[in-house]
Amino acid sequence: MNPTLALTEDLIRRRSVTPADEGCQAVLETRLKALGFTCENIVSGPDDFRVTNLWAVKRGTQGTAGKLLAFAGHTDVVPTGPLDQWSSDPFEPSHRDGKLYGRGAADMKTSIAGFVVAVEEFVAKHPEHKGSIAFLITSDEEGPAHDGTVKVVEALKARGERLDYCVVGEPTSVDTLGDMVKNGRRGSLSGKLTVKGVQGHIAYPHLARNPIHLAAPALTTLVNEVWDAGNEYFPPTTWQMSNIHGGTGATNVIPGHVTIDFNFRFSTASTPDGLKSRVHAILDQHGLDYTLDWTLGGEPFLTPRGDLSEALGAAIAAETGVKTELSTTGGTSDGRFIAKICPQVIEFGPPNASIHKIDEHVEVRFVEPLKNVYRGVLERLIA
């Protein structure tokens, strides 16, 4: 078995459901120390949600004056869902029809294994490499992400650590390896809106104020609002409701309040403060008595075309013959934190059709090419 596949299987066997790491980072640390990496463990979070983070660095011959290329990834995985719906044990790697099955196979233990082995091969070939290499690994990406990458970034920023390039191993490919990479992500802004009314008997509406009826016109306005037109890199900002709850459960009672959960996925054409102001203005125009709590999940980030995108595109083309597409679609990732200390952040990994699903898998034919692309990026940027 090739080293990349062997390491991937070792990681899959570890039941690292957020925030558990289950020894994944210890495995990585052992291999990285053997290459001369200096490893730092950053543990964060409350006792009932302890998060393990690993920051590992190997300096090149140019020291801190040289370029630093980091790989960012997460060892945690989402829960399995119903075990009886899996074709095999999600934490026991299984090969069927040219695919490797297991939770985390696509998201993102294959990427982590691929970059580790790529670095091993790169260092063996270029022992005097000029630039530096780093790994930023967390066990809190699939969860609340309060004590994962963001904490490492804060620590690095506080001591003036500079990152020049960062490859995030998220599964970005669609139909075949390398057909899409992410050079940015939209921001996420959520709101919990509570519109107040007056509870009463449904047969006496004149003695009550129905908050659902009061909120409906404002919600229609919000649904139809054009928030921005997007730009060259991002689609227009979207506003979507995810939950509406009002009522006591009885069919003859007008509720006293209704609560609506909503979310913006926004581009660099809008700002969180600007979106908040516009929502409040619409609600105020409709004369609502309301409270509104906001949660900023992350601001958008964008890496324009540059050294990293060119190196990654060239490495993908050389290995697969595929001309990659730069995209900012999809959900948020830890790239939003890393972008605060790194000017060039790009995500690249295997196809994502099975992520978070029953029978998650990666096609075995993509495992070695993925590793080779990562090695190609290292060779193009820091050799």
UniProtKB/Swiss-Prot annotation:
One of its GO terms (molecular function) is succinyl-diaminopimelate desuccinylase activity. Zn(2+) 2 binds at residues 107, 142, 356. Its EC number is 3.5.1.18. The active site is at residues 76, 141. Its cofactor is Zn(2+); Co(2+). GO terms for biological process: diaminopimelate biosynthetic process; L-arginine biosynthetic process; lysine biosynthetic process via diaminopimelate. It comes from the Bacteria. Zn(2+) 1 binds at residues 74, 107, 170. Belongs to the peptidase M20A family. DapE subfamily. Catalyzes the hydrolysis of N-succinyl-L,L-diaminopimelic acid (SDAP), forming succinate and LL-2,6-diaminopimelate (DAP), an intermediate involved in the bacterial biosynthesis of lysine and meso-diaminopimelic acid, an essential component of bacterial cell walls. HAMAP family: DapE (MF_01690). This is Succinyl-diaminopimelate desuccinylase. It comes from Cupriavidus metallidurans (strain ATCC 43123 / DSM 2839 / NBRC 102507 / CH34).
